[in-house]
């Protein structure tokens, strides 16, 4: 809310240079500028406005600025499907790369499995690594990438599904897995 008091013989005012969604009204000698900017911008934009008084033989004016920052943006820039991978527990993850832009100055990620990390270089957040071994059932890791900036955060979600490696347990007697045999002699129980 921006307010100005009309002085002397001024009875009204006009305001120019406001961004879309911002308006003004004059009531009881007060000029009020208010609203929500509805603009499609990708970088910070400065709107210089001018308020000019009316109703007096000599009009006065003043200026001000409204600076509008864009909302955050984020996009998956690695191959389609990299944000929904299924892999074995000791296989490396294909890199998942997100690019943040507009109002975003950084990004964070949560929900990654052990062994998988993220790093930021420039405006790119890369998720990579090899899930740690030791699971016995399929594990689904939903993760969230959230931008950091001055305005509304952008959020994207993905999943990493980790399958356990097939395992074997020796069920015959101990030592039967390392036998020394002679020709024509069967494997011992």
Show the residue positions of the predicted features.
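Short, solvent-exposed loop/linker segments at the N-terminal edge
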Residues: 84-92, 178-186
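Extracellular/luminal low-complexity segments enriched in Ser/Thr/Pro
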Residues: 31-43, 126-137
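Proline-enriched interdomain boundary motifs that mark the N-terminal boundary
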Residues: 71-81, 165-175
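Low-complexity "stalk/linker" and mucin-like segments enriched in Ser/Thr/Pro/Ala/Gly
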Residues: 12-31, 107-125, 169-170, 180
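C-terminal edge beta-strand
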Residues: 58-70, 151-163
């Amino acid at each position: 809310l921006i307010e100005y008091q009309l002085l002397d013989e001024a009875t009204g005012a006009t305001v120019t240079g406001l961004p879309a969604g911002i308006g003004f009204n004059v009531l009881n000698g007060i000029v009020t500028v208010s609203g929500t900017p509805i603009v499609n911008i990708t970088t910070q934009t400065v709107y210089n406005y001018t308020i000019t008084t009316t109703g007096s033989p000599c009009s006065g004016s003043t200026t001000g600025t409204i600076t509008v920052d864009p909302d955050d943006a984020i996009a998956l820039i690695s191959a389609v499907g990299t944000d929904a991978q299924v892999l074995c527990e000791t296989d490396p993850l294909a890199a998942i790369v997100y690019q943040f832009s507009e109002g975003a100055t950084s990004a964070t990620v949560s929900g990654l499995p052990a062994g998988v990390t993220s790093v930021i270089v420039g405006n790119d957040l890369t998720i990579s690594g090899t899930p740690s071994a030791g699971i016995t059932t399929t594990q689904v890791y939903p993760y969230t990438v959230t931008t950091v900036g001055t305005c509304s955060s952008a959020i994207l979600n993905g999943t990493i599904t980790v399958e356990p490696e097939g395992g074997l347990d020796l069920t015959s007697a101990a030592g039967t897995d390392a036998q020394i045999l002679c020709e024509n002699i069967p494997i011992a129980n």
